[in-house]
Amino acid sequence: MPYFVVINEQGPAWDEKRSMRDQRGWDEHAVFMEALADEHFVVLGGPLKYLEHRAMLVLNAPNEVALQKRLAEDPWMRTGVLRTLEIYPWEILLGKLT
């Protein structure tokens, strides 16, 4: 199955006064993302250190449409706390993900 790199950023409902884990709906978002990781849909993911309020995901999906449909189910996506900025198909040439 192909890999994709997804860059997400804060959405219009992001509260600048709160940390990431204090955002509204954090617990539901975290449970959702952990389930995707358990299913191996999310291969790797986390915040980008020097790009405030952005995160990168490496996803294992059959195509971009399926990927977008699945990410749209994220509670943070549904409520506007998070939004997808960029999606790139990714080919691994060095190393391997196991």
List each model region and its residues.
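Conserved, structured core segments of small domains
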Residues: M1-T98
